[in-house]
Curated annotation (Swiss-Prot):
Protein name (Swiss-Prot/TrEMBL): Arginine--tRNA ligase
CDD domains the record matches: Anticodon_Ia_Arg, ArgRS_core
UniProt superkingdom: Bacteria
SMART domains listed in its UniProt record: Arg_tRNA_synt_N, DALR_1
Gene3D superfamilies hit by this protein: Arginyl tRNA synthetase N-terminal domain, HUPs, Isoleucyl-tRNA Synthetase, Domain 1
Subcellular location: Cytoplasm
Native organism: Pseudomonas fluorescens (strain ATCC BAA-477 / NRRL B-23932 / Pf-5)
Protein family (similarity comment): Belongs to the class-I aminoacyl-tRNA synthetase family.
Length: 578
């Protein structure tokens, strides 16, 4: 609806330019927002205040002329001036009701992508292998998954790329430690403790560290024995990751793994191509690219190091190879990198070098979707009591156990199997939603008590709202397919819920554009709150007439479907009963 209003305003401005009321050459960014008080309309624009000065008119006078020039539209009943010059737009309730009825007959709930479908690469999760995933991997994994799901729902071809750290010193450490301490494959499955012991030896013994580095050199040279061990370590580590992805209900598979090692053969080509273009400069023995737009605090050029003085490659080298692959081989139109925002400068430099070097052969928009840190209650990065890194599996297990205690307290009569299955959904959903509901770029404090609360913007609250809507049809004893009639909007609670449901497509397009799932979380929370008000104030099964009951059942069903679809796009599971 907002896009429709923007188009109508643009047509009115064009008309006023033709009439000489407005000067030529105006290209205003037309803003249309939802109103808070629906008695003053459903949407508002400040366009008259933006253009009053170039028009040489008072905002309210210009607003009058814009309203007079607005083309009629069936979805709008009227437009009015408010305050110093706002233009408020009122939806046609009959047209709104018809749109919602149409959404009920559409698998996509009437949602369409605002622009053309694209091929989009999602760079997400990307843990360093050789050890288990920890809480620091949660945000990239679930935010990337949520955005990928939304883009797919809107019609994009999404290519997930799990750029795991599967190459480097850590594998030399593991191989050196295995030489000293031969163990069975079963013992090796406890990779975390094995890695910790190897790291301790690496830090304490220079001789061990030298052996580890030597094994890395052999690995890079293609030594068969080293490659066999490396493959074993990698497979064990990836199997750990896959269990986490399945537990988190994240759409990542082994087929999506495209780790650092996948680009090894192209790294020398990256270096040679940069050299051939005269972009590589030697600095303190390292091969670097200097770009004018990157300088340090003293105004000196910042290097993008491509090859270290010892001949080793860096993340930038691999990322440049990945850019070239994603543009040239995958033919992506857009590449979204869900990586900690502390890597912002790194990606700015990589993207700039890639463009300068012509590595983006297929037009591809590259965006670093940086995110903030998950902190403990003290506001510091989340750690164990002894200061160690919290394993992701331990966090999720604790979430399930806490949810189990909560569900059992509220429903002690439920069978044990039901308690466990409900607790698993509530626990995992709560951890994910607590993260996804925060702005992507913000830090936040992890708090089990808040995220498992049945009040406020939490997963349990939304799950309950969904089961409440689904419960209406259980009480009715009929499936929705048996419900006829059409939506009619009269009560204030009906109108407010209907207007919010009609915004679903706009919300999803915002998530797709900005890579910010919290927008969808806020929307679903609003829908749940408005449905609660509707449920309490507008009798559904006890409606005054069959026509009214059918209308309210249809609103309830659209609410149920919207909540379910929205939660599933966030990667959350729903419960039919709690």
């Amino acid at each position: 609806m907002k896009d429709t209003i923007r188009q109508l305003i643009q047509q009115a401005i064009t008309q006023l330019v033709t009439e000489g009321v407005l000067p030529e050459g105006l290209t205003p960014a037309i803003q249309v927002e939802n109103t808070r008080d629906k008695t003053h309309g459903d949407f508002a624009s400040n366009i008259a205040m933006m253009l009053a000065k170039p028009a040489g008119m008072k905002p309210r006078d210009l607003a009058e002329k814009i309203i007079a020039a607005l083309p009629a539209h069936e979805d709008l009943s009227k437009a009015e001036i408010a305050g110093p010059g706002f233009i408020n737009f009122f939806q046609n309730t009959q047209a709104l009701a018809a749109r919602l009825d149409a959404a009920l007959g559409d698998d996509h709930l009437g949602v369409r992508k605002a622009g053309p479908a694209q091929r989009t690469v999602i760079d997400m999760s990307a843990p360093n292998l050789a050890k288990e995933m920890h809480v620091g991997h949660l945000r990239s994994t679930i935010i990337g998954d949520g955005v990928a799901r939304v883009l797919e729902f809107l019609g994009d071809t999404v290519i997930r790329q799990n750029h795991v750290g599967d190459w480097g010193t850590q594998f030399g450490m593991l191989m050196a430690y295995l030489e000293e301490n031969p163990i069975t494959s079963d013992e090796l499955s406890d990779l975390e403790n094995f890695y910790r012991a190897a790291k301790q030896r690496f830090d304490e013994s220079e001789a061990f560290a030298d052996r580890a580095r030597g094994l890395v050199v052999k690995l890079q040279a293609g030594d068969p024995d080293c490659l066999e061990l490396w493959t074993k370590f990698k497979d064990i580590s990836l199997s750990h990751c896959q269990k986490i992805y399945e537990l988190l209900n994240v759409k990542l598979t082994m087929a999506d793994v495209m780790g650092e090692s996948a680009y090894n053969d192209d790294l020398i080509n990256v270096v040679n191509d940069l050299k051939a273009q005269g972009l590589l400069v030697e600095s303190n023995g390292a091969q670097c690219v200097f770009l004018d737009e990157f300088k340090n605090a003293e105004g000196e050029p910042l290097p993008v190091i491509i090859v270290k003085a010892d001949g080793g490659y860096l993340y930038a080298t691999t990322d440049l190879a990945a850019v070239r692959y994603r543009s040239g081989k995958l033919k992506a139109d857009r590449a979204l990198y869900f990586v900690d925002q502390r890597q912002a400068l790194h990606f700015q430099q990589v993207f700039a070098v890639a463009r300068k070097a012509g590595f983006v052969t297929h037009p591809m928009e590259m965006e670093h979707m940086g995110f903030g840190t998950m902190n403990g209650a003290d506001g510091r990065p989340f750690k164990t009591r002894d200061g160690g890194t919290v394993k992701l599996i331990d966090l999720l297990t604790e979430a399930e156990e806490r949810a189990y205690a909560l569900v059992k307290e509220k429903n002690p009569q439920l069978p044990e199997a039901d308690l466990r299955s409900i607790a698993k959904v509530v626990g995992i959903d709560s951890v994910k939603y607590a993260d996804l509901s925060k702005h992507r770029t913000s830090d936040y404090s992890f708090n089990f008590d808040l995220m498992l609360n049945f009040e406020g913007n939490t997963a349990p609250y939304l799950l309950y709202a969904y089961t409440r809507a689904a419960g209406v049809f259980r009480k009715l004893g009929k499936d929705f397919s048996e419900v006829g009639g059409q939506i009619e909007l009269h009560a204030a609670q009906e109108l407010e819920l209907a207007a919010k449901l009609a915004q679903f497509g706009e919300i999803l397009n915002n998530v797709a554009e900005k890579g910010t799932p919290h927008i969808l979380c806020t929307y679903l929370y609003d829908v749940a709150g408005l449905f609660s008000s509707f449920y309490e104030n507008c009798p559904i099964l006890a409606a005054e007439t069959p026509t009214q009951m059918h209308s309210r059942l249809r609103l309830t069903e659209l609410t149920r479907r919207t909540l379910k679809q929205g939660l599933e796009l966030l990667g959350l599971k729903v419960l039919e009963q709690m």
